[in-house]
Amino acid sequence: MSHQYVSRIIWTGNRGAGTSGYRSYDRSWDIAIAGKPVIHCSNDPLLGGDPARMNPEDLLLSALSACHMLWYLHYAAVDGIVVTRYEDIPMGMGEVGAGGAGRFTAAVLRPRIAVRHGSDIAAAHAIHGRIH
């Protein structure tokens, strides 16, 4: 079964002069997906972005964590393990090269999960290895 996802990425940082100079524009942009609220975003603050807005690295890290969580909950339900709480505080690492280009280098997921008393804890831990 194939899936298709469509979003619009709209640059909103034109201060009137476009990209006439490196500092003449903002790194702000919106994510617009039909039927959903618009998400106002920016670049990472280290690269000139607005620290009050989500940046690509925030979104990538959150998407990785959320996908892992949703698959974990799926496998837990299928395996009869009752999850009562799930929270993750993932951490992403990046670096800026000598030329100023940034890149995302790693992500570490750190989920904290509570299961119903009497659940098979070893089986609950093993679920993580089944998620790709």
What residues fall within each predicted segment?
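Extended beta-strand/beta-hairpin segments
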Residues: 1-62, 73-132
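Alpha-helical metal-binding/catalytic segments enriched in His/Glu/Asp
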Residues: 64-68
